[in-house]
UniProtKB/Swiss-Prot annotation:
UniProt organism field: Phoneutria reidyi (Brazilian Amazonian armed spider)
Designated name of the protein: Delta-ctenitoxin-Pr2d
Function in brief: Blocks voltage-gated sodium channels (Nav). Causes rapid general spastic paralysis and death when injected in mice at dose levels of less than 2 ug per mouse.
Cellular localization per UniProt: Secreted
Domain of life per record: Eukaryota
Keyword check for Oxidoreductase: no
Broad class of the protein's primary localization: secreted
Pfam families to which the protein is assigned, alphabetical: D_CNTX
Length: 47
């Protein structure tokens, strides 16, 4: 997806339970652990 008024998706790194994740368009942090995405409910438990 793209951000409103922008041509390209925006991503930035963020902290996910001590692991690197990505925030897309100032949305919630999206986390990776190995090859597996951490489910949103699991991420909530890390905060």
């Amino acid at each position: 997806g793209t951000c409103a008024g922008q041509d390209k998706p925006c991503k930035e790194t963020c902290d996910c339970c001590g692991e690197r994740g990505q925030c897309v368009c100032e949305g919630p942090c999206i986390c990776r652990q190995g090859y597996f995405w951490i489910a949103a409910y699991k991420l909530g438990n890390c905060k």
